[in-house]
Amino acid sequence: MHYLPRREFIVQGGAALVALASFQSRIASAFPSRAGEEVIKWLDQLPPNPVPQVIKNQLVWEDLDSWVTPNDKFFSIAHFDRPVIDESTWKLEIGGSVKKPTTLTLADIKARPRQEVTFTVECSGNTGLPFFNGGIGNARWAGTPLAPILKEAGVLDTGIEVVFWGTDKGEIKRADDVKFTQNFARSMSLADAMDPKNILCYEMNGSPLPPDNGFPLRLIAPGWYGIANVKWIKRIDVNDQRFENRFMGRDYVTLREEDHNGETVWVETSVGRARLKSAPARVTHIGDDYRIVGAAWGAPVDRVEVKIDDGPWMPAAIDETDKADFAWKLWSVDWPKPSAGEHTVTSRAVDTGGQVQPAMDDPIIAKKHTYWESNGQVTRRINIH
């Protein structure tokens, strides 16, 4: 991520205004859809998904027509199996470095204070693989705050990390040829786990969690990539030492080259909080009146800019009909009477602190050697007839 220098912003902003005048463009709200409009399919459609058992229900960007993603259109990732859980026998265990180990039923959890959050969840590998650009969705999540449960269990002074164990499990093979079966798990620091925004979630868009999205209980940690929002939770442990497993120390680790005083240093970091990002979703038209619609998320978004081909950046209109601190913002820009032929559409988001979604040739993206945290500017191709 980089900052847009003031001079560059002024120059590009002025160019954008000139471009807007030449386009005779007008700003319009992103939703609802215009009556009679036709969606034009992107030329760069995804190839077949080679791992349908792992990635299910990717968002089809051209179909994006609402702020909240319906449950039946929400993506799901499973690293192991997709467990079938009987609510009547399911229990949540809380243990480790606590004074009072606790066991809760789903009824116990639902009887506790209720908290809701609208949060856009994105897989950290989204757009990092050629067959994967729909690992994202926005939902209204409801459950009970995590922090009071940990406080009631009595976290010991030695506790430093909280581990969330899922019911899903599979075989792990280490380089030394040791094989074993292990449940999925991720951890975060005790301080991060105690964030009052985190909830143990049992409801999605007003309905019980769907099986593929974590029934009966999952963690919802607003502002974090999807991997941290553990599904099918069965146990929560407070640890007195750092937790490492496949999904903390090997997978979901970003590798980058960084320049330090003229020397290249290879840096590995664990995937955690979401990064600023945007993407064009669809292009629609009524006759010669075209409109580009998209979304921006991952940080408090101040504005979104769009460019067509190698033209200047133009400001997009952000739809303020629905909004929440951790939900995506939908945006649009009108594109009157584009020339026939193939065009590219690129978007970039700018957050309230001035950080700009990086271009694909920005060193933070270009020198990244893993597909995690792929928040570079997204360019789509389209053909205008």
Where are these regions (language model features)?
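N-terminal secretory signal peptides and thylakoid transit peptides that target proteins
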Residues: M1-L17
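Structured, non-membrane catalytic/scaffold regions adjacent to prosthetic-group chemistry
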Residues: F31-H385
